[in-house]
Design a protein with these regions (language model features):
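A conserved acidic beta->alpha catalytic loop
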Residues: 40-49, 95-96
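Acceptor/aglycone-binding surface of glycosyltransferases and processive sugar-polymer synthases
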Residues: 53, 62-68, 72-82, 87, ...
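Short, well-formed alpha-helical segments that are part of the catalytic scaffolds
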Residues: 12-27
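Donor nucleotide-sugar binding loop of glycosyltransferases
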Residues: 12-15, 43, 72, 98
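Short beta-strand/loop segment that forms part of the nucleotide-sugar
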Residues: 32-43, 64-65
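Cell-envelope/extracellular polymer assembly enzymes that use nucleotide-activated donors
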Residues: 2-4, 35
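Hydrophobic helical membrane-anchoring modules
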Residues: 180-317
Length: 317
């Protein structure tokens, strides 16, 4: 099979028939063998009924229906598990992503040998409340991930080589960082294509506003930390703990030495415990010890994890 199209959706009953007809037309013109996998993420409208109706007349339509809303990452993960095409295309169901982009995305994967190609909506028809946070988010994501050629990490329109989606795990809210996940899994040839962005035709945006924006940054930091130190927590916690303990120890030695010098010169010196520096030093030593032990426990967990030797292998003979 040439192409699997994975479409996560939530309350998109009006756009589903039109979107499928558009995809089908593009596939037939280019004579691709294909499947369309709709993942209904707990919709409360008749989205699932529309998918079932389409499947009755089209054996290329497959559906997955969640009992409740789990989020886009969960929907993509299940769609990826079911996909069988040589190239996997993801797109949103709101008709803002154009299926006419599929042939060129397919060509870039198959002929130019990209592992992943992400769409770039250079001209957007979204409100400022969405476009401004998106630009700030993408600038940060480029810096943290090291993928400097991508301008739109969260674009729903992407193309993947099949082995990419079978070797990454999309969870939580990590759908925004699939290129970063792919890079960490060893798929480094990542490209970008400027794609046409259309104004929403039906319904309203499901964008979560500033809350989603800040959550995105927290997810990015979590992913970066896990990538850098997930298998070696002692390197970061042990270092920070040792540094804090050392600074606290030096400070408390200075406090004690100051007291001894005053006594040796016959001067009356206040009690060591009367000095605020004593308590500050003691606090730093305690925190340093706790950080060190956190790193030690993290190292024990990492070394005894079932995934500690989970390595991505390109070829074997």
């Amino acid at each position: 099979m040439n192409i699997s199209v994975v479409i996560p959706l939530y309350n998109e009953e009006e756009s589903i028939p039109e979107l499928f007809a558009w995809i089908k037309r593009v596939m037939e013109v280019h004579q691709y063998s294909f499947e369309v996998i709709f993942v209904n993420d707990g919709s409360t409208d008749s989205s699932w009924d529309k998918i079932v109706e389409l499947s009755k007349d089209n054996d290329t339509v497959h559906g997955i229906c969640f009992r409740r809303n789990y989020g886009k990452s969960a929907a993509l993960y299940q769609g990826f598990k079911k996909a069988q095409g040589d190239v996997v295309i993801t797109m949103d169901a709101d008709l803002q992503d154009s299926p006419d982009e599929i042939p060129e995305l397919y060509r870039m994967i198959m002929e130019e040998k990209y592992d992943l190609v992400s769409g770039y909506k250079k001209k957007r028809y979204d409100p400022l409340s969405k476009t401004l946070p998106t630009k700030l988010f993408n600038a940060t994501a480029r810096k943290v991930s090291g993928i400097h050629n991508l301008h739109d990490f969260n674009c729903g329109l992407k193309a993947y080589r099949l082995k990419v989606v079978k070797n990454i795990e999309v969870y939580g809210e990590m759908h925004r960082y699939i290129p970063y996940l792919a890079k960490n899994a060893g798929f480094s040839k990542i490209g970008e294509k400027v794609v046409h962005h259309q104004a929403r035709k039906y319904g309203s945006t499901k964008f979560g506003g500033l809350n989603r924006f800040f959550n995105g940054y927290l997810d990015l930091l979590s992913l970066w930390f896990l990538t850098q130190f997930g298998l070696k927590p002692m390197h970061v916690f042990g270092f920070l703990g040792s540094l804090m303990f050392f600074i606290g120890f030096i400070a408390i030695v200075i406090v004690g030495a100051t007291k001894l010098c005053a006594l040796s010169n016959g001067l009356r010196a206040p009690l060591v415990t009367d000095s605020p520096y004593f308590y500050l030093s003691l606090t730093m030593m305690i925190l340093g010890t706790q950080l060190f032990m956190t790193g030690f426990l993290g190292e024990l967990i990492s070394r005894n994890s079932a995934n500690r030797n989970n390595y991505q292998i390109e070829d074997d003979f």
